């Protein structure tokens, strides 16, 4: 069961109420709350709320570590395996990650921190990352908009890690759909009320 909504929509408070009513535990699918050092913008539950209701994927990464859909998938599978409750409530604003998890992810190369740094340095040195991607893998470049820097970067990470054109790598490593069915619920909030809520949060 997943509850999604933008920052300031009230999903965190609602998730606490639902978890209490349903006797559930909470998995935080949030690209900010997963970091130990980020607290204000992420609207993490209080220590008291966490004491009463078990939360997963909070304060997991240091600020210099990267999060991605593959990491959240691994953490979600771990949480489902060890949770003591019948219901695990997935809560967050990262609908992109949830969509990626549900549709399926390909296995990605396991890299050391040193290898990650080296690859990042090589990609940063490119004058035109999209043009380079087009030169090594026209098929993959055709599927990605030139302004989609995230997907371009991910494709180049695959290339530098495997020395294989990304389209060939994904053909050999097809997506694996998520093994569990998840019911989705989304919160809809008036835009002005949402902006006011976010302003108030950042003042505190």
Protein language model features and the residues they cover:
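Phosphate/pyrophosphate-binding catalytic cores of soluble transferases and nucleic-acid-acting enzymes
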Residues: 1-204
